[in-house]
């Protein structure tokens, strides 16, 4: 909704309900550390006030409330048909200030333009946890555990024209956060920010590309076959500043106790080759992904 003010200003309200299910298919998981089944249900509302920033950017002040529900198994050794899930849920409030400049030509698989994005957030809320009754764990439910943290995320994504046939894209992304770990390893990974630079990475779950603090970068050589068709090779590297790791107690192997690893101690990368047909109303792609962890 655009407001009748001297400076162009708009008010944007969003209400979203999301229900995600990650099945037992191993195509979605790359190590047995992550449970074979995860369900995430999210209900959140956002209110944003936007206005121009400098000449070609916009700024937004936002407030949000969300109820996040995670249902998961902490081990794959439990017979799945008889299993019930651990349940973590969160009531979170946040305030944010963001600045964005975006001239990318498309939302998916862009080949020209530039995006610069910076957001600062303050988040506060509570965590509650109920263990699965079939997990044989000695864990007790936890009451309201308060979490508060500051988070800063920056992203630079730009595509340059090298010739009539070739473009080159590059990406840099960084997240800095004071966020604490959750009750257990799986809950901590589920609630950590994820690096999802491709459409495919947005619909699968991979713990190797989740961390509360990380740096990531990428290169995208692009061959333009026609005005609507192009071939691209997207290559990305991901380095958690402090990787989320887990310790398994001997007296209760079901539970993973989370802790932070050493500074910049791990590095993962992913690659995707894709042929993309970009229509005015639809994007069609045929791709092959490679992930190394």
Predicted segment positions?
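Gram-negative/organellar outer-membrane beta-barrel architecture
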Residues: 1-104, 108, 190-199, 204-215, ...
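A short, hydrophobic secondary-structure junction motif
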Residues: 40-49, 93, 121-130, 149-159, ...
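C-terminal outer-membrane beta-barrel translocator/porin domains of Gram-negative envelope proteins
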Residues: 85, 94-226, 230-243, 248-250, ...
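C-terminal beta-signal and terminal closure region of outer-membrane beta-barrel proteins
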Residues: 248-290
